[in-house]
């Protein structure tokens, strides 16, 4: 840490969920290694995700999510965003950052608006295949846009967009070194189920119901790790106990990358961070996009991996316990297919995304344009 602040300060702004904070954490790790003093601006939800940042480098900015059309609620929301703008200006006057990078979520609006109005270079990173609402609102103001799954060379902001991939945290890169080893037909079958950093109620009900429909000899092979919301944890655990299936059920796993590396098969939502980690580590998956995502971003993320042959995608509405049981039984008895899926997933992973994004961040901080960056990085 001795070289911190040799280069100056960069502030990362991210909404307080794992999907926004994990790529911010990955970029922070890379920038620190290059001598930057990295601070995080976020909201109050972020507490359990920010262990990678020193406490005095985490700044809670007042914010609110724009939802609905109630005039009173909208007035309160815009008042909170205005207060966040004042918070951000005060913070930036003290830190004097050379760059502010946004990772999506409404809590990024105040810091990015404040930075652009103060003449501080700005960059946003969009993790998904479809740009989220906060980033859409910022895209016209920022100096550069980095994309995880955004379509290349298309859209209104193609000229200032660079496809970097989604940065993954160091533990993911460590897990990626573990090769995929398929389970033999009589071996224990390690199943990992998770719904992103906030869990998934649907999985807590559907997976135990599907496991109950499996033949007894198939159930006896299962070892399950399942992330469940706190309110669903006890019922999911009890369901597996009743079935006699060993299951580790918890609201959050700090060692999720290692658990993914240990898995023979993954059933998950298809948020950008989830899909990116699956591809970097290289594991076969069934993806069930969250059906109520505002911009259908999860469906687009899942389609990108399915097109490469790295995952099966199933709509939640089509996934009855019976169908889920059939698909799980098929996965358990087709190790060669899962091995091919794992290879296909890994082939589209971008383990160097943090390095590429850090290169872009340093270029924008130094005053370069996106065009100059692209020309300097052509092979």
Swiss-Prot record:
InterPro entries referenced in this protein's UniProt entry, alphabetically: GlcNAc_MurG, Glyco_trans_28_C, GlycoTrans_28_N
Coiled-coil positions: none
Keywords: Cell cycle, Cell division, Cell inner membrane, Cell membrane, Cell shape, Cell wall biogenesis/degradation, Glycosyltransferase, Membrane, Peptidoglycan synthesis, Transferase
Reaction equations catalysed: di-trans,octa-cis-undecaprenyl diphospho-N-acetyl-alpha-D-muramoyl-L-alanyl-D-glutamyl-meso-2,6-diaminopimeloyl-D-alanyl-D-alanine + UDP-N-acetyl-alpha-D-glucosamine = di-trans,octa-cis-undecaprenyl diphospho-[N-acetyl-alpha-D-glucosaminyl-(1->4)]-N-acetyl-alpha-D-muramoyl-L-alanyl-D-glutamyl-meso-2,6-diaminopimeloyl-D-alanyl-D-alanine + UDP + H(+)
Compartment(s): Cell inner membrane
Primary subcellular site in the record, as a coarse category: membrane
Membrane topology listed for this record: Peripheral membrane protein
Pfam family, any one: Glyco_transf_28
MF-aspect GO terms: UDP-N-acetyl-D-glucosamine:N-acetylmuramoyl-L-alanyl-D-glutamyl-meso-2,6-diaminopimelyl-D-alanyl-D-alanine-diphosphoundecaprenol 4-beta-N-acetylglucosaminlytransferase activity; undecaprenyldiphospho-muramoylpentapeptide beta-N-acetylglucosaminyltransferase activity
Superkingdom assignment: Bacteria
Pathway(s) served: Cell wall biogenesis; peptidoglycan biosynthesis
Chain positions recorded as UDP-N-acetyl-alpha-D-glucosamine binding sites: 17-19, 128, 169, 197, 298
Cysteine pairs bridged by disulfides in the record: none
Record-level GO BP terms: carbohydrate metabolic process; cell division; cell wall organization; lipid glycosylation; peptidoglycan biosynthetic process; regulation of cell shape
Keyword Glycosyltransferase appears in the UniProt entry: yes
The keyword Transmembrane is assigned to this record: no
GO cellular component labels: plasma membrane
Reported function: Cell wall formation. Catalyzes the transfer of a GlcNAc subunit on undecaprenyl-pyrophosphoryl-MurNAc-pentapeptide (lipid intermediate I) to form undecaprenyl-pyrophosphoryl-MurNAc-(pentapeptide)GlcNAc (lipid intermediate II).
Family statement: Belongs to the glycosyltransferase 28 family. MurG subfamily.
Protein name: UDP-N-acetylglucosamine--N-acetylmuramyl-(pentapeptide) pyrophosphoryl-undecaprenol N-acetylglucosamine transferase
Species of origin: Brucella canis (strain ATCC 23365 / NCTC 10854 / RM-666)
Originating gene: murG
């Amino acid at each position: 840490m001795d070289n911190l602040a040799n280069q100056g300060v960069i502030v990362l702004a991210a909404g307080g969920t794992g999907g926004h904070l994990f790529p911010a954490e990955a970029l922070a790790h890379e920038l620190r290694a290059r001598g930057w003093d990295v601070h995080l601006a976020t909201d109050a939800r972020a507490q359990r995700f920010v262990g990678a940042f020193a406490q005095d480098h985490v700044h809670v900015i007042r914010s609110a999510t724009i939802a609905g059309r109630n005039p009173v609620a909208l007035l309160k929301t815009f008042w909170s965003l205005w207060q966040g703008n004042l918070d951000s200006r005060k913070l930036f006057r003290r830190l004097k950052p050379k760059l502010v990078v946004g990772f999506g979520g409404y809590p990024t609006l105040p810091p990015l608006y404040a930075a652009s109005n103060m003449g501080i270079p700005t960059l946003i990173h969009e993790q998904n295949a479809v740009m989220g609402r906060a980033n859409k609102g910022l895209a016209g103001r920022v100096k550069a846009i980095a994309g995880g799954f955004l379509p290349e060379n298309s859209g209104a902001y193609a000229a200032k967009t660079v496809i970097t991939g989604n940065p993954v945290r160091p533990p993911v890169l460590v897990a990626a070194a573990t090769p995929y080893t398929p389970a033999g037909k009589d071996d224990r079958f390690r199943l990992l189920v998770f719904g992103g950093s906030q869990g998934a109620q649907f999985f807590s009900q559907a997976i135990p119901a599907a496991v109950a429909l499996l033949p007894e000899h198939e159930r006896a092979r299962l070892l399950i790790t399942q992330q469940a919301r706190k309110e669903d944890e006890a019922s999911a655990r009890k369901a597996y106990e009743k079935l006699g299936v060993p299951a580790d059920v918890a609201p959050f796993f700090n060692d999720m990358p290692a658990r993914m590396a240990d898995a023979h098969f993954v059933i998950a939502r298809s948020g950008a961070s989830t899909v990116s980690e699956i591809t970097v580590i290289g594991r076969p998956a069934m993806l069930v996009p969250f059906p109520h995502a505002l911009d259908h971003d999860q469906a687009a993320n899942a389609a990108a991996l399915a097109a490469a042959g790295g995952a099966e995608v199933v709509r939640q509405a089509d996934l009855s316990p019976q169908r889920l049981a059939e698909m799980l039984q098929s996965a358990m008895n087709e190790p060669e297919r899962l091995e091919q899926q794992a290879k296909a997933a890994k082939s589209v992973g971008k383990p160097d995304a943090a390095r590429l994004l850090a290169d872009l961040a340093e270029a924008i901080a130094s005053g370069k344009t996106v065009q100059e960056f692209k020309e300097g990085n052509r092979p």
